[in-house]
Amino acid sequence: LFVIPWGRHWIIGTTDTDWALDKAHPAATSADIDYLLGHVNRVLATELTQADVEGVYAGLRPLLSGESDQTSKLSREHIVAHPAPGLVVVAGGKYTTYRVMAKDAIDEAARGLGGDVPESATENIPMVGAVGYQAMWNRRAALARESGLHVERIEKMLMRHGVLITEILALVAADPSLGEPLPGGEDYLKGEIVYAASHEGALHLDDILARRTRLSIESFDRAITASRPAAELVAPVLGWDAATIDEEVEHYHQRVAAERMSQTMPDDAAADAARLQAPDRG
């Protein structure tokens, strides 16, 4: 069991069960939530209940098949195979080893090219926003003074965006209203919401509230309050008219309702059916 501090929140997980239903919308059941709470309550002085849970998310990871039917006993490692000329296959693995997987896959593909191809260097390439991070962190007080934002706000944004914070601060400098907190999602600036649409490829409201930010699991109302202000902020960037704003907000509300309903269900089949009442947009 993991109990991970995450800002003002704690992440508790994970379950380890098979999922044979819709792959695009895996859903946590009430039994899944109770399972995690039951385990964490063994070590807490004050027990948690489902009423204490702000948000829930579920995902899938591919496991290599084996002799056991129990997912907990299957390998978390990955394999790279070259089953046919020009075809490289990666199976298994997980998010935390994605760079090792990428290196192994590229090195395997390069072996089929012939000639002197250097090894993949992906594991040594800094992530986007990482180059110069420490120097900018050391300047966080100066960034706060220059932008008029509190230094704690700058620190949070640096941890989320790295040195790309300068792009958000440029938006704030051009429109100081974007330096205000998002109504209903005060851990984020309005400028961060606009940035999700202008620089990070968000196309729909749920892209912003559930993926570019984590507002959908960081508040008890699942970002319902923040949904319309967020939609209105990105409307000029994405070319939305009033009808599209209403449609995006309504779809997000339906998504939240479907997720909430799925998390009251006792089994996977019922949770899957509930979640699919509001599938994500492509």
Model regions and ranges:
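C-terminal accessory subdomains/tails of enzymes that are appended
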Residues: 5-9, 15-282
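Phosphate/diphosphate-binding loops
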Residues: 1
